[in-house]
Swiss-Prot record:
Subunit architecture: Homodimer.
Native source organism of the sequence: Gloeobacter violaceus (strain ATCC 29082 / PCC 7421)
Superkingdom as given in the UniProt entry: Bacteria
Name under which the protein is recorded: Histidinol-phosphate aminotransferase
Cofactor dependence: pyridoxal 5'-phosphate
InterPro entries from the UniProt entry: Aminotransferase_I/II_large (IPR004839), HisP_aminotrans (IPR005861), HistidinolP_aminotransfase (IPR050106), PyrdxlP-dep_Trfase (IPR015424), PyrdxlP-dep_Trfase_major (IPR015421), PyrdxlP-dep_Trfase_small (IPR015422)
Gene of this entry: hisC
Family: Belongs to the class-II pyridoxal-phosphate-dependent aminotransferase family. Histidinol-phosphate aminotransferase subfamily.
One function term, GO molecular function aspect: histidinol-phosphate transaminase activity
UniProt entry tagged with the keyword Transferase: yes
């Protein structure tokens, strides 16, 4: 029973808890399988020792980091906001548009669960519009839902998670013309190499989210950023928490951009491994495989229960994510992928291929 001074609607929500299996191959969180190089970790340790006074708050407006992000993305510094992971920026965008009964949040589902979760924790109405059978977006259906439900912010992951597919240019152009804030979440940009950044100057209602948690290997540091026209960026600065990004996280993100030629050099291997897993899974008639432009694959068992398959793979040491009636499989190291392939082969008999 909830205490009387707590919001009763929170009683139905579940706290987010990630599973912990230290001995298993972690292919369930879309992290890059490679840690930072040892020399870069040593550099961060040196920067922590020389440049961070732990008794002082971190820089509240990290101008150097914003300038580095702006240079990387081809925008100006006043178009950049940084956050404690993209989650904080999603929360700030909802706060800036919908709080106090002023509007509804929308997205096309299945998709990244935090759009819904963060709206619900803020007591903001959320509408999830169903994707098509192949997980595309029906612009007519989405536009009608936006118009009929008082939507003020529309979140679209591009590529989408858990399905890995990109929106077409035509869909982006059409949805960008809607009279709402349109947020394109490009968390996997470095793998897809598709970005709507050039549209920022044409569409003042467009916001792009990105992260250092995936291709840049900094998931532990929780650094996300938003790109938007300066007016929207200025509002996001008003609603963010003070000192929201720890000093070491700022240094890590700056160093990652400084050495991006080294860190991003791992991406061709990840994409090659993704294609290798795709070729293997395509041989199984009982598995429906979907095209991906990210560092993961989405597969849907045609007959077997997806949760039973997930549990069986976990029992064999390969952790994958159950989602949307299927399985999301992160591309790991070649050795991890070898074990995944062997584990899948062990679960499906030859006649099921």
């Amino acid at each position: 029973m909830m205490q009387p001074y707590l919001r009763p609607d929170l009683d139905r929500l579940q706290a987010y808890h990630a599973p912990h299996f230290p001995e298993a191959d972690k292919l369930d969180a879309n992290e890059l399988p490679h840690d930072l190089p040892e020399w870069l970790k040593n550099k961060l340790a040196f920067l922590l020792e020389q440049g961070v006074r732990t008794n002082r708050y971190p820089e509240g407006d990290p101008l150097a980091l914003k300038a580095a992000i702006a240079e990387y993305c081809g925008v100006t510094s006043e178009m950049v906001c940084v956050g404690n992971g993209s989650d904080e920026l999603i929360r700030s965008l909802i706060t800036a548009t919908c709080l106090g009964g002023r509007g509804t949040v929308a997205s096309a589902e299945p998709t990244f669960s935090m759009y819904r979760i963060l709206a619900e924790t803020l007591a903001v109405p959320y509408i999830g519009v169903a994707r098509t059978a192949n997980y595309g977006v029906d612009a007519d259906v989405l536009e009608a839902a936006v118009g009929a439900n008082g939507v003020r912010v529309l979140f679209l992951a591009n590529p989408n998670s858990p399905t890995g597919n990109l929106l077409s240019d035509e869909i982006i152009e059409r949805l960008g013309s809607l009279p709402v804030l349109v947020v394109l979440d490009e968390a996997y940009y470095e793998f897809s190499r598709f970005s709507a950044v050039p549209l920022l100057w044409e569409r003042p209602n467009l916001v792009i989210l990105r992260t250092f948690s995936k291709a840049f290997r900094l998931a532990n540091f929780r650094v996300g950023y938003a790109l938007a026209n300066p007016e929207i960026a200025a509002v996001l600065e008003k609603v963010r928490l003070p000192y929201n990004l720890p000093g070491l996280s700022q240094l890590a993100a700056f160093a990652a951009l400084e050495h991006r030629d080294v860190l991003l050099a791992a991406i061709p291997e990840i994409l090659a491994e993704r294609r290798r897993i795709e070729r293997f899974l395509a041989d199984f008639e009982q598995l429906e495989l979907f095209p991906s432009d990210a560092n993961f694959l989405f597969v849907r068992p045609r007959i077997a229960d997806p949760e039973a398959v997930r549990v069986a793979l976990a029992g064999r040491g390969s952790l994958v994510r159950g989602a949307a009636g299927g399985l999301r499989v992160t591309v790991g190291t070649p050795e991890q992928n070898d074990r995944l392939i062997a584990n899948v082969a062990a679960l499906f008999t030859p006649e099921m291929r």
